[in-house]
């Protein structure tokens, strides 16, 4: 059985559904620019592991995340559980989202629009989001 029902590093019993939804959200953002790269997939997998998913469960959860994202028509369902998590958890998600956006070296208006909607849905202060964006963008420009 899945080990992901154990307490994750950031507190609370995450459960499989949380990780699948986070993965689906990250995949959705990665696909917005119609360039879903291996680098983006690696960022998504690394993020899931950093949030407490075990290596044993990564393959299955990632596959389910891709299926859920493919069969979904709105991002709201991916953010329901995230919005109730603590700020540190949300910051890790937003950092991963910006890493995915800047992985190809550019950001477009669709990615920016999606980020504004997402950060509103998870209730994270826009100043924090802006600081994270600048930090990630600068790390890719080095």
Name each model-derived stretch.
Residues 1-28, 37-142:
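Small-residue-enriched hydrophobic alpha-helices in membranes
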């Amino acid at each position: 059985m899945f080990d992901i029902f154990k307490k994750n590093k950031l507190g609370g019993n995450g459960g499989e559904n949380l990780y699948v939804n986070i993965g689906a959200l990250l995949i959705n953002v990665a696909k917005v620019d119609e360039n879903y790269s291996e680098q983006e997939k690696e960022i998504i997998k690394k993020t899931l592991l950093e949030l407490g998913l075990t290596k044993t469960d990564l393959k299955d959860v990632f596959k389910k995340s891709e299926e859920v994202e493919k069969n979904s028509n709105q991002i709201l369902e991916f953010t329901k559980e995230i919005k109730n998590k603590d700020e540190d958890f949300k910051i890790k998600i937003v950092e991963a989202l910006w890493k995915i956006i800047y992985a190809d070296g550019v950001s477009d208006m669709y990615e920016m629009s999606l980020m504004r909607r997402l950060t509103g849905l998870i209730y994270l202060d826009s100043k924090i989001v802006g600081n994270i964006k600048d930090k990630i963008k600068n790390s890719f420009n080095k």
